[in-house]
A protein has these predicted regions:
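Alpha/beta-hydrolase-fold enzymes
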Residues: 112-196
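Catalytic nucleophile-loop/oxyanion-hole region of alpha/beta-hydrolase
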Residues: 43-45, 72-102
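Catalytic active-site module of serine/aspartate enzymes centered on a nucleophile-bearing elbow/loop
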Residues: 247, 254-283
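Active-site glycine-rich loops that stabilize anionic/oxyanionic intermediates
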Residues: 41-44, 227
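Short beta-strand/loop motif that positions the catalytic acidic residue
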Residues: 217, 223-225, 229
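Short alpha-helix in the alpha/beta-hydrolase fold that links the catalytic acid
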Residues: 219, 233-242
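Conserved alpha/beta-hydrolase
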Residues: 53-77
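N-terminal cap/lid segment of alpha/beta-hydrolase-fold proteins
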Residues: 1-28
C-alpha cells in the first residue's frame, strides 16, 4: 500500500462565523461506492490522512477532508471556538459540499479523536442523510486534561478571558509506534498544540452530552481504539459502546497508540474499515 496520494480537488467553503475553511477530495479510478467525509483531530489537518485516503480510494470510495477552523490551512485562531455549535455548523457546511459533489452516493463520516467527538455529537443531533459513522480514539476519557482543579480554573477563565491559550499537546510520540510518523508530525508546520480555555470548557460540555445521549444514536457505528492510547483512554470507548442500541462494532487494537490509521498495524485497521464500509453500503 502506498502512503502518499495527490488530491484531485482543493477548494474552500464558508464555515461558522464566516471563516474560510479549506477542503480537498480524492477519487477512485472506478465507479464510486460511497462518499467518506473525514473530520480530523485536535491540532492536525486533513493532509495527515494519506493512509486512509489511499486505502479507501483503492477500495472504490470517494474521500473528502477539511481543515476545521483554527487548524491547518483554514482561518480562525489556533485551537479556539466561541461555542461548540461552531463545530456543528462547520461539519454541516462541509457535508453540504460533499453532497454537491456526490449527491446520490451513500454518505459515511469518519472522525478521529476530537473529530470523533464532533462526529458523535453531530450524529446525535443531525443523523439525517448519514449512512454510518466511523469513530477513532474519541476523547470520552481524555488523559490528564479533565482533572477537577484544571476544570475549575478553565471554567473561571472561560468566562473572563476565553481566548487565553495554553499548550495542551500530548507529544507526537504518543500518536504512533512508528518512528517515521512521529518524526513527520514533529516537523509538520501545519500541526499545533495550542488551545484556549473556552475550547476546553466547550469540549467538556460536549463530552458530557455524548455520554448522556449516546443510547439515542440512530446510525450504524464502527468504533476504533488502540488499547495503549495515552491521549484518550480506551475505557471511554468501551463505556459509550455498551449502551448503543443500533448496529455497532468495536475494534480494539492490542498495543495500539492514539492514531490507529497511522500506527504499525494500520494496514489491518484499514482492511477492517473497508470491510465494515462494504458491509454497510445498503444500510
Amino acid at each position: 500500500m502506498t502512503t502518499t496520494q495527490v488530491s484531485q480537488l482543493e477548494s474552500t467553503f464558508c464555515g461558522a462565523n464566516g471563516l474560510s475553511l479549506f477542503y480537498q477530495a480524492w477519487y477512485p479510478q472506478r465507479t464510486v461506492k460511497a462518499a467518506i467525509a473525514i473530520v480530523h483531530g485536535f491540532g492536525e489537518h486533513c493532509d495527515r490522512y494519506s493512509t486512509v485516503t489511499t486505502a479507501l480510494t483503492q477500495a472504490g470510495y470517494a474521500v473528502f477532508g477539511f481543515d476545521n477552523q483554527g487548524h491547518g490551512r483554514s482561518e480562525g485562531q489556533r485551537g479556539h471556538i466561541n461555542r461548540w455549535q461552531d463545530y456543528r455548523d462547520n461539519v454541516s457546511a462541509f457535508l453540504a459540499q460533499v453532497r454537491q459533489h456526490e449527491p446520490n452516493s451513500p454518505l459515511f463520516v469518519l472522525g478521529h479523536s476530537l473529530g470523533g467527538l464532533i462526529v458523535l455529537d453531530f450524529a446525535l443531533n443531525a443523523p439525517q442523510g448519514l449512512t454510518g459513522i466511523i469513530i477513532s480514539g474519541p476523547p470520552i476519557r481524555p488523559v490528564g486534561i479533565a482533572k477537577p482543579y484544571l476544570v475549575a480554573i478553565a471554567r473561571i477563565l472561560s468566562g473572563i478571558w476565553p481566548r487565553f491559550s495554553m499548550d495542551v499537546g500530548a507529544g507526537a510520540e504518543t500518536l504512533s509506534r512508528d518512528p517515521a510518523v512521529v518524526n513527520q508530525t514533529e516537523h509538520d508546520p501545519l500541526t499545533h498544540s495550542v488551545a484556549t480555555v473556552r475550547w476546553g470548557t466547550e469540549c467538556l460540555v460536549a463530552i458530557a452530552a455524548v455520554r448522556r445521549n449516546i443510547k439515542q444514536l440512530q446510525v450504524p457505528i464502527l468504533l476504533l481504539h488502540g488499547s495503549a492510547d495515552k491521549v484518550n483512554d480506551v475505557k471511554g470507548s468501551r463505556e459509550i459502546f455498551e449502551p448503543i442500541a443500533v448496529d455497532k462494532t468495536l475494534n480494539i487494537y492490542p498495543g495500539g497508540y492514539h492514531e490507529p490509521h497511522n500506527d504499525l498495524d494500520r494496514n489491518q485497521v484499514m482492511d477492517d474499515v473497508v470491510e465494515w464500509l462494504d458491509n454497510h453500503l445498503n444500510c
